[in-house]
């Protein structure tokens, strides 16, 4: 994937200023689940080596066709938007394939040009639903248990404050339990086929080890 920048704004000197939207995707996991919103960029802009990326942004990505077909493309369980690109990348890492960031490649992209036209409450609900689905597909064992405990704690706190978004998202998640089960089964079948299985925590450790000697900033 490329570095993604906003369309230019004009500064006081009337020169084009491009804000960086996305860099390489930085892995971040905790008992609260998998975070997909962190990016990192090398401080040395002349660096020419590819950098490992947690996943590839759906805004721009060059993907091996054969591997994409084996992965089954984007999982439609995330329709209409959000988390489908993160899911595809994590599935690729799970079976031993890698995602890379090319620091010299640049893509200009207007962020959320379509989604910004939709009602914000609906967007928030879909994001929360897909976040729950994503974590329930990719977390295992005690990590999944802690995530769901934290989820219900957040839900209760939000309900006390009069916000029912997480509760509604949980209901939508429960409606998709069968599809989630099928998505997990397909991933495990592909892992058996490739004879490899790496958890999100294995992927996080691998990426952090690879970039250990590189100076970078997280945003």
Sequence positions of predicted segments:
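Acidic/His-rich active-site region of diverse nucleotide-sugar glycosyltransferases
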Residues: 1-73, 77-80, 95
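Short beta-strand segments
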Residues: 1-4, 101, 148
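Short glycine/proline- and charge-enriched loop/turn segments
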Residues: 44-47, 71-72, 108-118
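Conserved active-site beta-strand element of glycosyltransferases/polysaccharide synthases
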Residues: 62, 80-83, 89, 98-103, ...
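Short, hydrophobic alpha-helical packing/hinge segments within bilobed ligand-binding/sensory domains
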Residues: 88-89, 131
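Catalytic core of nucleotide-sugar-dependent glycosyltransferases
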Residues: 99, 117-143, 164-180
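Non-catalytic, C-terminal membrane-associated alpha-helical segments of glycosyltransferases
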Residues: 143-219
């Amino acid at each position: 994937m490329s570095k993604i920048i906003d369309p230019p704004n004009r500064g006081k000197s009337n020169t084009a200023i491009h804000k960086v939207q996305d860099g390489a995707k930085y892995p971040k996991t905790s008992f609260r689940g998998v975070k997909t919103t962190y990016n990192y960029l090398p401080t040395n802009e002349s660096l020419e080596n590819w950098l490992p990326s947690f996943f590839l942004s759906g805004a721009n990505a060059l993907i091996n066709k054969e591997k994409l077909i084996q992965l089954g493309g984007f999982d439609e369980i995330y329709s209409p938007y959000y988390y489908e690109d993160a899911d595809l990348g994590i599935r690729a890492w799970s079976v031993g394939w890698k995602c890379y960031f090319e620091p010299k490649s640049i893509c200009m992209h207007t962020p959320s040009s379509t989604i910004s036209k939709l009602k914000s409450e609906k967007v928030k609900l879909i994001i929360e639903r897909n976040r729950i689905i994503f974590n329930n597909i990719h977390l295992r064992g005690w990590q999944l248990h802690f995530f769901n405990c934290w989820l219900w704690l957040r839900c209760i706190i939000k309900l006390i404050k009069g916000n029912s978004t997480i509760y509604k998202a949980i209901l939508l998640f429960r409606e998709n339990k069968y599809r989630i089960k099928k998505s997990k089964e397909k991933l495990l079948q592909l892992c058996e086929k490739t004879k490899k299985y790496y958890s999100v925590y294995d992927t996080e450790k691998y990426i952090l080890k690879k970039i250990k000697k590189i100076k970078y900033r997280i945003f």
